[in-house]
C-alpha cells in the first residue's frame, strides 16, 4: 500500500492567523507544487512519510549556553560574547577543533578556565523543552522516521579511549558515533525517539549552509518534499526552504502540535500507546 502525505495549502501558513510560518517549496516548479501526495524515492516504499528532521538545541533540548554558561564565567551574555574568540565555537561545532583546543583559544586573551566545570554546568542545564518529549514519544509510536539535524560539537567524555575499545569489540561506526553525544544522552536519552544522524561536528558543515541540507537529502535518499524540518532559528528554516524542504519555525510545543496536525502528521495517542 502506497504511503501518501498531503501537501498543505501554502496560503494557510502565510496568513496572520497561522500559529507559526511554514516555508514550503519556494523554488519548486508549479507541477511539483500541484502534486497532492508525496512519494518515496526508489527503494524507500516501506518508510512512513514525511521524514521528520529536528534541530536539537532550543527546539528539543534547552540550550544552557545563553544563561548557565555566562553565569559559570561570572559574566553577562553580552560580556561573554565580547571576550570570547569570534570563530572558536563555530570551528568546534564543525569538528575542526576538539574541546582541548577550544579551551585553549575560547577567550581572546588566552585565559584558562575549568573545562570539566564548564561541561558539568552544561550537563546540568540540559532538559527537554516543555511538552517535547511527549510529542517525540507519540511520533515514534506512530512509526515516523525521525532524525536529529543539528549544529552540535563533540564533547569528549573519555571518548578517545572508549572509541578505541569499541573498535576492538567490533562495534559499528554509528554505535561509536552515538558515544559522542553522551552528555545529552546520559541525561535525556534522546536516542529513544530519534537517530543522531546529521550533526555538524561529523559532517563538517553547519546550518544554514545549503550543502548541509543537500547532504541530508542525499543520505536519506528522498526528495526534499518528503521531509519536514523543525528549527528555532529562522535563518535555518529559510535555508531549508530554499532547497525545497517543508520547514517549520519552532516557537513552542503547542504551536508545533498545531502546525504538524494541520500538515497531516498523525499526533494522535492511541489507547495501547498510553499503556506503554
Please report, for each region that a protein language model flagged, where it lies by residue.
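Conserved Lys-Pro-Asp/Glu-containing loop-to-beta segment of HAD-superfamily phosphomonoesterases
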Residues: 206-234
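Active-site neighborhood of HAD-like aspartate-dependent phosphohydrolases
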Residues: 25, 31-86, 90, 243
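Short acidic capping loops at alpha-helix termini that bridge into adjacent secondary structure
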Residues: 192-196, 224-227
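Acidic, Mg2+-coordinating phosphoryl-transfer loop and its flanking beta/alpha structural elements
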Residues: 224-262
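N-terminal chloroplast transit peptides
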Residues: 1-24
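Short, acidic loop-to-helix structural element flanking the phosphoryl-transfer center
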Residues: 48-51, 115-150, 154, 158-173, ...
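A metal-dependent, Asp-based hydrolase signature
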Residues: 90-120
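Generic structural signal for small/hydrophobic residues in well-ordered secondary structure
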Residues: 55-58, 95, 148, 197, ...
Amino acid at each position: 500500500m502506497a504511503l501518501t502525505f498531503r501537501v498543505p495549502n501554502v496560503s494557510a501558513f502565510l496568513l496572520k492567523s497561522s500559529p507559526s510560518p511554514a516555508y514550503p517549496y519556494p523554488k519548486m516548479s508549479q507541477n511539483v507544487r500541484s502534486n497532492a501526495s508525496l512519494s518515496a524515492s526508489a527503494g524507500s516504499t516501506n518508510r512512513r512519510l514525511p521524514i521528520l528532521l529536528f534541530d536539537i538545541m532550543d527546539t528539543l533540548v534547552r540550550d544552557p549556553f545563553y544563561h548557565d554558561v555566562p553565569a559559570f564565567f561570572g559574566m553577562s551574555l553580552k560580556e561573554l560574547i565580547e571576550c570570547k574568540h569570534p570563530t572558536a565555537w563555530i570551528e568546534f561545532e564543525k569538528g575542526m577543533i576538539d574541546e582541548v583546543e577550544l579551551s585553549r583559544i575560547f577567550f581572546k586573551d588566552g585565559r584558562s578556565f575549568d573545562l570539566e566545570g564548564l561541561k558539568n554546568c552544561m550537563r546540568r542545564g540540559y532538559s527537554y523543552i516543555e511538552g517535547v518529549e511527549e510529542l517525540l514519544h507519540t511520533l515514534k509510536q506512530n512509526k515516523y522516521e525521525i532524525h536529529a539535524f543539528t549544529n552540535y560539537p563533540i564533547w569528549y567524555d573519555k571518548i578517545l579511549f572508549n572509541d578505541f575499545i569499541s573498535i576492538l569489540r567490533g562495534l559499528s561506526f554509528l554505535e561509536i558515533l552515538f558515544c559522542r553525544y553522551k552528555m545529552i544522552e546520559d541525561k535525556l536519552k534522546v536516542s529513544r525517539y530519534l537517530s543522531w544522524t546529521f550533526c555538524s561536528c561529523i559532517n563538517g558543515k553547519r546550518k544554514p549552509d545549503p550543502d548541509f541540507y543537500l547532504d541530508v537529502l542525499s543520505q536519506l535518499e528522498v526528495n526534499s518534499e518528503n521531509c519536514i524540518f523543525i528549527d528555532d532559528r529562522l535563518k535555518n528554516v529559510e535555508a531549508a526552504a530554499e532547497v525545497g524542504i517543508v520547514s517549520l519555525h519552532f516557537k513552542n510545543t503547542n504551536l508545533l502540535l498545531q502546525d504538524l496536525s494541520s500538515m497531516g502528521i498523525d499526533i494522535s495517542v492511541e489507547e495501547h500507546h498510553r499503556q506503554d
